[in-house]
Amino acid sequence: MGTYPNGDRVFVKMNTTPILAALAKEQIAPQLLWAKRLGNGDMMSAQEWLEGRILTKHDMNSKQIIQILGNLHRSKHLVNQLLQLDYHIENPFDLLHEWEENAAYQLRENGFLQDVVRDLKRHLPEFRAEIATIVHGDARHSNFVITTSGLIYLVDWDSVRLTDRMYDVAQILSHYIPLAHWPQWLSYYGYKNNDLVMDKIYWYGQFSYLTQISKFFDSRDMEHANREIYELRKF
């Protein structure tokens, strides 16, 4: 947080995605007020300070979230911006390879997680690069904020990437939406409820557990890392 001399507050962040202005223009993220490069090369940005709160797990069934993800995933302009910034389109194999490259040794050697990764490699879902979209990459409830006026925004864009939109969709469904409500959620988003879609949900859902396990492990939050492993076993 930063504060102006007149007492106004702003949300200040270092080295976040350069597309914040475009995200704000599409009302996906809070308004970008300014950005400047510091002497050491870091980029500092300031966003509008929002009076509100972080969403809880129980808030994640809001239709606003589906609308936000839909607007994000349908934006060709944002895809083109990321391509101009040298982001690369990632297919399912790329995602798994990156996880294996970056996951802690203890996770890579975990027998259960090894089995999950091997199974995901054997059942790579269909992927077409020409319809890859921008995805947030970490659509946890703690990365959504709701203002006092009831508007929801998506924040913390450090994990943004270009891949299948199911990357975000499956994280929401696997972590927050009861199975019985999946058909209604998918219909509102615009997906057909068929075997191909369900197979993708289960693939990307399992992968979302892997990414969350790795994030929590890296931050030494073993309670939540173990919780994700437990939920992955049940998924």
Residue spans of the language-model regions?
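Structured catalytic cores of enzymes that bind and process phosphorylated ligands/cofactors
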Residues: H73-L85, A132-V135, F144, L162, ...
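Active-site Asp-x-Gly
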Residues: T147-V197
